[in-house]
Amino acid sequence: MTERDFDTPVETPTVQPAPAQGAKPAQTVPVVAVVLAAGFGTRFDPDNPKQLVSVGGKPIVCWSIDAFEHCDRVSDIVVVVNPKVRGEVETLVGEMGYTKVRVIIDGGDERVDSTATALDMLATAGIPDDAKILIHDAVRPFVEQSAIDGSIDALDQFTAATVAYASTDTVLLTEDLGDLKVVKSVPDRPNTFRAQTPQSFRFATIRHAYDLAAADPDFHPTDDTRVVVDYLPDEPVAIVSGAETNLKITTLEDIPTAERIAEEILGRDPKEEARARMHALLAQAAGQMHR
């Protein structure tokens, strides 16, 4: 797939009509969704890449791309893939006619490597420092539009934000004592959240954090928020309300839960059900290519 130009702000007249009541303000900078689909899932079925597994008649990666494609405020999408499934993902993207997917690129060995690769590509493409970058795990297929909108809005006040879901369980922080783990502290439950995605940043902020991290030989974070928290500790990271349904599909045991969520979504939206049937046909063809 050839790379297409990223959207840039269009000069607007000095006088503009007031937005309709309840309407979101017009974007003045690019809003770029980076969909990370490069993991191969060692805890999943090694012979069946989970990005291409069909849930509710639609490949997991397509659920995630759809969420950003259908958000009017997102201007561009970058998909980061494992080279082994690049052809299949390109086929799905091409057949579905996604208009916002600008480029599909190969990711790295680890999640942070894939993010770093995407940031390098965006810098080369000339993305402005104040662009809003939403980084999302492709294997969280049921992200809600409210979480995407909330992430975009949060970046008007902060330079970093993450979708998170309030923990309903007490969380224990532990330390090693001999061969066992023991409780070190118990944080107050109202202050504990389960990190989800998208994790969102102004481009200059996340780029600077990754530049600092790259110089650290002990750099081993598991997500992008951790990079900002560790390397730019003076930058507050806003919490955007997530949902229990925004689950990460990690093992085969997660599929039945995902199917139930998909069934509920499809039951609410007949148009989504029609799209899912089309996706199912394309996923079947892509699966045959993978074999």
Curated annotation (Swiss-Prot):
Looking at the record's lineage, which domain of life comes first? Answer: Bacteria
Q: What class of enzyme is it?
A: transferase
Gene Ontology biological-process entries: isopentenyl diphosphate biosynthetic process, methylerythritol 4-phosphate pathway
Which residues of this protein are annotated with the site description Positions MEP for the nucleophilic attack?
A: 189, 248
**Which EC numbers does the record give?**
2.7.7.60
- Keywords noted in UniProt: Isoprene biosynthesis, Nucleotidyltransferase, Transferase
> GO molecular function terms here?
2-C-methyl-D-erythritol 4-phosphate cytidylyltransferase activity
The catalysed reaction is:
2-C-methyl-D-erythritol 4-phosphate + CTP + H(+) = 4-CDP-2-C-methyl-D-erythritol + diphosphate
Renumbered to this chain, region (Disordered) spans: 1-23
Query: Known Pfam families for this protein?
Result: IspD
Per the UniProt record, the site (Transition state stabilizer) maps to 43, 50
PANTHER family recorded: 2-C-METHYL-D-ERYTHRITOL 4-PHOSPHATE CYTIDYLYLTRANSFERASE, CHLOROPLASTIC
The job of this chain, per UniProt, is described as: Catalyzes the formation of 4-diphosphocytidyl-2-C-methyl-D-erythritol from CTP and 2-C-methyl-D-erythritol 4-phosphate (MEP).
| Protein name according to UniProt | 2-C-methyl-D-erythritol 4-phosphate cytidylyltransferase
Task: Report the source organism.
Answer: Bifidobacterium longum (strain NCC 2705)
